[in-house]
């Protein structure tokens, strides 16, 4: 509409004069319309958090290499990309029972929490132990009973053979007369021999008959030798004093009570020791012969050859000796044995769980490999990790972090421990940033409002006057956040900085617009105009400068909407909408408030309050500038040279983690994790290899293709900045012998494929290589290593035919940051040109001058360079931090928009005075004097509003708040009062120079504007 007024040959003043008529006649309706707009925005306002994003890398362009790699990993690989939650457990030694109890209890607590259904997997070192104990118990149980069966067979061969003969002999003797001669005993022996062997032969496996027949014959021969043919015996002597089992025991094993054994004693060990050539079999037969006994009364009972307890004890002891397991595991192996043969999965699982709960890292009978162990427990054993994987299609993990932390506290209490525990990882960072952003708002906004009320109240000498800007901009913020929700829902995700930056920008700029309008109203009232005329004249003359100022802000942030970097795009759109709403409110609702409340807004003061001391200062400043303009110009230039040198020579930091305060749990956990595991362990860089061939099947691997992938893994490992590599041929960080796959048994082949599986895609044609960087993933050194990896990929493709025909993509958090930086760097140049050209065009149309817009842009760039240099020096030398990489473009955009306000207010007032007939010098002096107080007040309001961002705990907001504070104070108190008048005094008529066509149009507009304003406002 303002442009329409220019097209029709009259200036913007005419448009605002007519707008003022609408406001005067419909002020109450305007109130109602804005209240309705606020009410309509409330439902969207309440949901705005749902469209806020807290990760910078989430704004990575979708067509970037890292974004494409990320999508491939999500689709093809069942592995974390650094987006998992992490529970970090710290202590002097996390291998003890305290960490064990907590980790096990935490697993159970998280799994049983219905609010955490989006957790797909929970993994810690005790999960590894649990799986290993389950497998160990199952395998050992099978081995134990296989060993027991063999032991029972050997015992039966050695002692069962003699036992059968002794029993047969006892039966025969018991059926004979009470007395027996030696000849009769010999007959008993022959009869027992005849009946025993068929029984023995029927029970001995055929493969052992050739071994046992000579052994039996030796036993029978020795049995006969144990009797004296000339002696007389009775049944008592044969069956009780020298019982058959005792006689057989002496023959097989010997009599321990005799110092010298008869030659026919202890035949078992002698026979099997000399008859078996296989050393393993010989060892078993001799061990059984040594351990067991035939006779079970009473001293030999625990070692009775056919006793279950004896078999159990021997089997367990043999297993311990065979496997080299220490005696401390005797009870554990015994419990596995006691499951019985072929136990159910449930019983094995229950035992494994109990062993896990009751044992420790020190005592478990099975240990994971060092590579697997080191993924969960640090080298110094002071830090342990629990990894929480989230479902890809589940609720946002960020919303589960507080519940997880609550469960961590519950698990800590239930386990009876008091460990130092942190929940960190990408979702925790995002949650903590969200919480910190809310805390920042709760901390910053009240201070901002207080400062604005204080400054406006002091400026107007009123308690009521501050309520209009605060209420008006507060309403506009509510409406603007409703629009932000729509942007986040239908256009682009919204960066979390919008929550702080947009309200502050609106409070700063919007309040300036309100103050400028109210101040002009007070000036008109002081000149003797009534309320209606004052509202009309203030809007007519101040409206143009307000719109011009607001248009530069809207344009500056609007250019960011064209950025390829989503973070800048979302901030630009949000603040552009916010300032637009604030501008509309200032031009409609504030004049309506002036119409409704009038002079009562200045209670308890009055409209015409004098401020002689301020007038004197600005008059003196104008006089000083008139006398020393060259000195002012030279001073400004002398400051600009070193400031510019500092800006271009100092670097910036891309470290996302540095933005997160150390006081937050996620940052503290991250710091502990980095100390224990190294900076790149949890957020590795990965290379996706999309091959044209299949890499594996259920029982087959493509060794030729894997050789090329292994070459890529080894090449990556040799690169500076890479500390470890994982991949199909390095599944645990060390190479495996994949080339011998065909020589392995089915079980070993399955195990090898299973170990490779996390790094092989579901399509069977893709592979992933992880590179653990030795520097923090968000640091500049990590980005440098990332660029080297990408360069190495091209080299690999030139050296390997398979890789040359494959697609290789490098992704991960570092890659996302690098791609984001590349996109933002291109945006920086494009946006700088676009915003400066756009602002120049707006000022050219508004001021009808070519030089003055260029001069406005130059002076704001000077103040921006001074502020940037100051912030760099303060950040590096006092705060100990580098400048955040996104700060320069954000500061430029914000200050090209907001920083021009005061210059525009001054220049439009000078132009107004020139239009009314004053000379350039007189107009400059008068404008500086009349606008000094109001522009200073506006500058203090904006500086105060943005300075509250230094109360934030987020580094970027601290630096941005400090930079804007410096720029605004420089612009309002120095540039506008001293430098601008100095330049304009020297340029004289060039201040208003423009091409003839623009100059002629400007004269026509000014002439028509003056005539029509006289008609509209009256010639006062």
What residue ranges belong to the model's regions?
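Membrane-embedded transmembrane helical bundles of large multi-pass transporters/channels
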Residues: 1-55, 163, 167-171, 177, ...
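Structured non-transmembrane domains adjacent to transmembrane bundles in polytopic membrane proteins
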Residues: 63-81, 92-250, 254-427, 651-852, ...
């Amino acid at each position: 509409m303002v442009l329409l007024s220019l097209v029709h040959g009259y200036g913007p003043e005419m448009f605002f004069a007519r707008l003022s008529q609408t406001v005067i006649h419909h002020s109450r309706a305007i109130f109602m319309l804005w209240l309705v707009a606020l009410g309509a925005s409330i439902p969207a306002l309440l949901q705005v958090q749902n469209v806020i994003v807290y990760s910078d890398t989430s704004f990575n362009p979708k067509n970037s290499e890292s974004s494409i790699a990320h999508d491939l990993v999500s689709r093809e690989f069942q592995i974390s990309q650094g987006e998992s939650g992490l529970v970090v457990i710290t202590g002097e030694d996390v291998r003890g029972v305290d960490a064990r109890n907590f980790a096990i209890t935490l697993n159970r607590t998280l799994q049983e929490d219905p609010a955490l259904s989006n957790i797909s997997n929970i993994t810690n070192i005790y999960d590894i132990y649990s799986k290993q104990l389950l497998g160990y118990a199952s395998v050992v149980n099978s081995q134990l009973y296989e060993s027991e069966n063999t032991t029972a067979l050997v015992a039966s061969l050695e002692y069962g053979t003699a036992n059968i003969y002794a029993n047969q002999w006892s039966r025969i003797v018991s059926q004979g007369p009470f007395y027996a001669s030696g000849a009769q005993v010999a007959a008993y022996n022959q009869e027992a021999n005849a009946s025993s062997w068929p029984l023995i032969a029927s029970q001995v496996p055929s493969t052992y008959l050739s071994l046992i027949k000579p052994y039996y014959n030796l036993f029978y021969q020795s049995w006969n030798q144990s009797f004296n043919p000339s002696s007389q015996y009775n049944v008592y002597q044969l069956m009780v004093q020298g019982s058959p089992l005792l006689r057989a025991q002496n023959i097989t094993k010997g009599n321990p009570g005799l110092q010298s054994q008869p030659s026919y004693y202890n035949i078992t060990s002698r026979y099997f020791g000399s008859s078996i050539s296989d050393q393993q079999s010989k060892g078993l037969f001799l061990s059984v012969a040594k351990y067991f006994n035939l006779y079970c009364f009473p001293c030999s009972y625990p070692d009775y050859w056919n006793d279950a307890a004896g078999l159990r004890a021997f089997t367990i002891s043999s297993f311990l000796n065979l496997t080299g397991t220490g005696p401390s595991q005797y009870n554990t192996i015994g419990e596995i044995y006691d499951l019985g043969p072929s136990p159910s999965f449930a019983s094995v699982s229950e035992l494994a769980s109990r062993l896990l709960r009751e044992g420790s890292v020190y005592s478990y009978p099975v240990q994971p490999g060092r590579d697997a162990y080191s993924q969960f427990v640090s080298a110094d054993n002071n830090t342990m990790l629990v990894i929480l994987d989230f479902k890809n299609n589940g609720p946002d993990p960020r919303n589960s972090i507080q519940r997880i932390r609550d469960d961590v506290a519950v698990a800590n209490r239930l386990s009876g421990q008091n460990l130092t525990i942190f929940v960190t990882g990408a979702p925790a960072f995002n949650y903590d940033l969200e919480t910190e952003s809310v805390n920042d708002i709760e901390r910053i906004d009240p201070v901002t409002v207080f400062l604005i009320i204080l400054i406006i109240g002091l400026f107007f000498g009123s308690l009521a006057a501050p309520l209009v800007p605060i209420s008006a901009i507060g309403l506009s913020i509510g409406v603007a956040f409703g629009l932000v929700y729509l942007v986040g829902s239908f256009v682009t995700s919204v960066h979390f900085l919008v929550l702080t930056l947009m309200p502050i920008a609106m409070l700063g700029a919007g309040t300036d617009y309100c103050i400028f309008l109210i101040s002009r109203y007070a000036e008109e009232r002081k000149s003797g105009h009534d309320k209606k005329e004052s509202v009309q004249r203030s809007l007519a003359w101040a409206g143009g400068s307000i719109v011009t100022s607001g248009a530069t802000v809207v344009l500056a942030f609007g250019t960011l909407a064209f950025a390829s970097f989503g973070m800048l795009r979302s901030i630009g759109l949000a603040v552009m909408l916010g300032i637009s709403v604030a501008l509309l409110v200032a031009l409609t609702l504030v004049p309506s408030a002036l119409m409704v409340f009038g002079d009562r807004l200045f209670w308890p003061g009055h409209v015409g309050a004098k401020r002689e001391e301020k007038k004197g200062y600005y008059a003196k400043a104008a006089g000083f500038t008139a006398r020393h303009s060259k000195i002012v110009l030279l001073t400004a230039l002398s400051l600009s040279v070193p400031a510019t040198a500092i800006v271009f020579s100092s670097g910036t930091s891309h470290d996302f983690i540095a933005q997160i305060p150390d006081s937050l749990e996620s940052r503290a956990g991250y710091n502990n994790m980095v100390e224990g595991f190294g900076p790149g362990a949890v957020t590795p860089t990965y290379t996706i290899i999309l091959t044209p061939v299949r890499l594996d099947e259920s029982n087959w691997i493509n060794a030729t293709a894997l050789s090329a992938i292994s070459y890529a893994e080894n090449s990556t490992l040799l690169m500076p900045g890479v500390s470890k590599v994982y991949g199909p041929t390095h599944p645990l960080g060390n190479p495996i012998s994949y080339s011998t796959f065909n020589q392995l048994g089915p079980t070993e082949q399955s195990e090898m494929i299973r170990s490779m599986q996390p790094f092989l895609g579901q399509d069977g044609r893709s592979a992933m290589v992880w590179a653990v960087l030795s520097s923090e993933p968000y640091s500049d050194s990590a980005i440098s290593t990332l660029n080297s990896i990408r360069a190495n990929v091209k080299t690999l493709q030139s050296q390997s035919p398979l890789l040359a025909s494959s697609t290789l993509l490098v992704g991960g958090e570092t890659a996302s940051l690098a791609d984001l930086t590349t996109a933002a760097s291109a945006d920086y140049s494009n946006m700088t040109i676009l915003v400066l050209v756009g602002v120049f065009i707006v000022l050219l149309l508004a001021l009808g001058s070519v030089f003055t817009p260029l001069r406005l842009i130059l002076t704001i760039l000077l103040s921006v360079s001074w502020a940037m240099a100051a912030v760099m020096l303060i950040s590096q030398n006092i705060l100990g931090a580098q400048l955040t990489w996104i700060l320069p473009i954000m500061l430029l955009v914000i200050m090209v928009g907001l920083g021009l306000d005061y210059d525009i207010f001054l220049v439009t007032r000078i132009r107004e005075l020139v239009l009314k007939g004053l000379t350039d010098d007189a107009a400059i002096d008068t404008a500086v004097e009349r606008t000094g107080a109001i522009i200073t007040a506006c500058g203090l309001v904006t500086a105060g509003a943005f300075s509250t961002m230094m109360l934030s705990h987020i580094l970027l907001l601290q630096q941005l708040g400090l930079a804007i504070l410096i720029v605004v104070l420089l612009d309002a108190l120095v540039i506008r009062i001293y430098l601008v008048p100095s330049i304009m005094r020297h340029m004289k008529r060039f201040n208003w120079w423009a091409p003839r066509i623009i100059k002629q149009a400007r004269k026509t507009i000014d002439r028509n504007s003056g005539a029509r304003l006289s008609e509209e406002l009256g010639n006062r």
